[in-house]
């Protein structure tokens, strides 16, 4: 399409786009909830909370857990629990617990989606500048990229703590475009959620929406990205590079 004709660089979301991080995130969320004697949520539910950064993830987890506990107690004929700790303080405690547990399980609970490693390698070898924009807390990002052996492909990495405003605000995309030395319209942004597409539109970047990510249970088509792909390596022909159906699926 016309918007992809003058692309000089590509920036990517992380969770749900390059990596399946749900197992690790869900494990850390559940361990944090369990430590506070709250109901655990499970991976299927946690997936619907991913995408707005760790603080929002904690808020969603705590809201659900308190409501779930109240429902369970009512079902058993027990009175509601008096909350000794305000919700804001409980979120802060939950976040500290989450950070500790996620640091323990992040690497083993995260794998690359199919074709990601080889596609990134092909894009990098073609001379395109590559960047990463994630709402994930910054301290977790670099070690994770290194463990998956994809850090070498990115010239710029922007984590959730590196900007004042996370996606869907355009700030992180505008920052990575600036650091890559290009105009926003020259940088393609690839993501799996409405936050990604909204950020791209607000920044003036063309966008690709991937169908296999998390996106709160919604179809990515509802966010109206410029292009929709089912497989990560569909990016290659779109950018004038050979498409390989035999790329290595690297998830070790």
UniProtKB/Swiss-Prot annotation:
Binding of Mg(2+): at which residues?
Answer: 13, 15, 192
Do you know which InterPro entries this protein is assigned to? Answer: HAD-like_hydrolase_sf (IPR050155), HAD-like_sf (IPR036412), HAD-SF_hydro_IA (IPR006439), HAD_2 (IPR041492), HAD_sf (IPR023214), PGP-like_dom2 (IPR023198), PGPase_prok (IPR037512)
Q: Which UniProt keywords apply?
A: Carbohydrate metabolism, Chloride, Hydrolase, Magnesium, Metal-binding
Cofactor(s) demanded: Mg(2+); chloride
Q: Does the keyword Magnesium apply?
A: yes
What are the recorded GO MF terms, alphabetically?
metal ion binding; phosphoglycolate phosphatase activity
Q: Which EC class is the enzyme in?
A: hydrolase
Pathway, per UniProt?
Organic acid metabolism; glycolate biosynthesis; glycolate from 2-phosphoglycolate: step 1/1
Entry's Pfam families?
Answer: HAD_2 (PF13419)
Could you tell me the Gene Ontology terms of the biological process aspect for this record?
carbohydrate metabolic process; DNA repair; glycolate biosynthetic process
Tell me which family the UniProt entry assigns to this protein: Belongs to the HAD-like hydrolase superfamily. CbbY/CbbZ/Gph/YieH family.
Q: What is this protein called?
A: Phosphoglycolate phosphatase
């Amino acid at each position: 399409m016309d918007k992809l004709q003058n692309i000089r660089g590509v920036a990517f979301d992380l969770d749900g786009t390059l990596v399946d991080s749900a197992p690790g995130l869900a494990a850390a969320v559940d361990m944090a909830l369990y430590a506070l004697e709250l109901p655990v949520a499970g991976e299927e539910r946690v997936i619907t909370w991913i995408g707005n950064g760790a603080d929002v993830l904690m808020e969603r987890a705590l809201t659900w857990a308190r409501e779930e506990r109240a429902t369970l107690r009512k079902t058993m004929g027990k009175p509601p629990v008096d909350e000794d700790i305000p919700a804001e303080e409980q979120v802060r405690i939950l976040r500290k617990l989450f950070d500790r547990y996620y640091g323990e399980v992040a690497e083993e609970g995260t794998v690359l989606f199919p074709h990601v490693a080889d596609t990134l390698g092909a894009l990098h070898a073609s001379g395109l500048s590559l960047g990463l924009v994630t709402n994930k807390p910054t301290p977790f990002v670099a070690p994770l990229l290194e463990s998956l052996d994809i850090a070498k492909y990115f010239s710029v990495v922007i984590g959730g703590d590196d900007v004042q405003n996370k996606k869907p605000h355009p700030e992180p995309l505008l920052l990575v475009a600036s650091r890559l030395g290009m105009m926003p319209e020259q940088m393609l942004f690839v993501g799996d959620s409405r936050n990604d597409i909204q950020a791209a539109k607000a920044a003036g970047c063309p966008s690709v929406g991937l169908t296999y990510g998390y996106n709160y249970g919604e179809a990515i088509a509802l966010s109206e990205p410029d292009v929709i792909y089912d497989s990560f390596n569909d990016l290659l022909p779109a950018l004038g590079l050979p498409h390989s159906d035999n790329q290595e699926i690297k998830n070790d």
